């Protein structure tokens, strides 16, 4: 079968999912004719993606999260205003996607959570089906329950997510753990789509690659570089704790060495994974993909959401486990409930270290769930 991918270029997660999906399809005799990637002035397409993806990559202007003045969290007001004011500028992108789909004539379109991809698909009047893929679709599931307060932004998020899924033949919702499907909403719950380089670090027989160890340092990733101030302030008081953080500062050197125990790295996927495998604990802005990588390797997690979508991820990775297990005071009938992560509004590394040493309970079923991905995804792309 012949596929075209449409990929949201914001952050790292959707890009690595596209890499994994292309590899899976090619290994099973399918063709990926093109990868259409949404770009924005604030982000540069990571070199690891351009280097790894085999299909031709074509770019189009797409929606963008606009950070606050401190470049820490996404500003809902600024993001909304920016994208509304630039809406006319997105019309050429919709036309571009529509035209390319007509030219390429794929058997299947895979949309990695890009709203302009959905609109371009609809305007193309293509008869081929569109599959939507992303963890955000799990928030539409009938069994996904939000808390009664503090998450009002999920209404706008779910409205947007419903728009992305408009006209999809099937919706594949990436999840930390198995859940029943939601046929009414065309939602199939599927494992995270991790790359072979990640899966090979923890084998099916339970043994680990020698690279997986506790190297004593804290590893981290911040989508918005403004969080680096949190890290610098903590480091000034705890200079004995090694820190290795990745950020999106393309204007800095590939590795910015602050001193012997603190370095900032521009995003490089091979180096990122190497540092993940060897860390004591991991701190992140709660993006789905790297959280799954840490959970797969059994690393304690600090999740620092920078916008409502990541806040929902953090909720799912913490309280979601308690709800699923019907736990009371953190205990279920046949043992401890997994507690892979803790959340904070800042990069509170004291909290992470305390959690790692005293409260962390790995989700030991997660690696098995993640290893099911290839067979599940091949099945879902065959039976449309």
Predicted regions and their residues:
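A short, glycine/small-residue-rich beta-strand->loop->alpha-helix junction that serves as a flexible
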Residues: 7-19
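Conserved nucleotide-sugar phosphate-binding/catalytic loop shared by glycosyltransferases and other
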Residues: 9, 27-28, 32-86
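Glycosyltransferases and closely related glycan-assembly transferases
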Residues: 49-52, 95-108, 118-131
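Conserved nucleotide-sugar donor-binding subdomain of glycosyltransferases
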Residues: 72-108, 115-116
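A donor-sugar binding/catalytic signature common to diverse glycosyltransferases
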Residues: 109-112, 274-313
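Active-site-proximal region of nucleotide-activated glycan assembly enzymes
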Residues: 129-189
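Leloir-type glycosyltransferase catalytic cores
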Residues: 163-170, 177, 321-384
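Donor-nucleotide binding loops and adjacent catalytic segments primarily
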Residues: 195, 202-278
């Amino acid at each position: 079968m012949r596929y075209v991918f449409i990929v949201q270029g914001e952050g790292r997660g959707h890009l690595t999912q596209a890499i994994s999906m292309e590899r899976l399809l090619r290994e099973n005799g399918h063709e990926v004719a093109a990868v259409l990637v949404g770009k924005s002035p604030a982000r540069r397409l990571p070199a690891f993606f351009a280097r790894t993806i085999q299909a031709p990559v074509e770019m189009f202007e797409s929606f963008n999260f606009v950070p606050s003045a401190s470049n820490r969290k996404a500003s809902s007001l600024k993001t909304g205003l920016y994208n509304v004011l630039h809406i006319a500028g997105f019309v050429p992108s919709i036309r571009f996607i529509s035209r390319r789909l007509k030219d390429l004539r794929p058997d299947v379109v895979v949309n990695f959570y890009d709203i302009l991809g959905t609109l371009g698909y609809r305007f193309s009047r293509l008869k081929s089906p569109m599959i939507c893929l992303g963890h955000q679709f799990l928030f539409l599931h009938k069994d996904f329950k939000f808390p009664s307060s503090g998450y009002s932004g999920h209404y706008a998020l779910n409205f947007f997510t419903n728009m992305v899924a408009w006209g999809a033949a099937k919706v594949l919702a990436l999840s930390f753990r198995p859940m029943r499907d939601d046929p009414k909403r065309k939602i199939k719950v599927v494992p995270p789509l991790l790359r072979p380089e990640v899966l090979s670090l923890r084998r099916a027989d339970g043994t680990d690659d020698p690279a997986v160890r506790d190297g004593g340092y804290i590893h981290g990733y911040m989508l918005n570089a403004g969080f680096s101030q949190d890290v610098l302030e903590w480091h000034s008081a705890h200079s004995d704790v090694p820190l290795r953080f990745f950020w999106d500062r393309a204007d800095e050197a590939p590795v910015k060495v602050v001193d012997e125990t603190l370095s900032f790295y521009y995003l490089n996927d091979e180096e990122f994974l190497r540092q993940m495998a060897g860390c004591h604990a991991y701190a992140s802005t709660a993006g789905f993909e790297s959280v799954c990588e840490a959970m797969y390797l059994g690393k304690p997690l600090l999740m620092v959401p920078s916008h409502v979508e990541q806040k929902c991820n953090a909720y799912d990775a913490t309280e979601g486990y308690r709800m699923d297990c019907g736990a009371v005071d953190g205990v279920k009938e046949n043992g401890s409930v997994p507690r892979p992560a803790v959340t904070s509004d800042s990069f509170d590394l004291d909290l992470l270290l305390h959690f790692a040493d005293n409260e962390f309970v790995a989700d030991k079923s997660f690696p098995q769930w993640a290893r099911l991905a290839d067979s599940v995804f091949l099945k879902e792309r065959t039976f449309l």
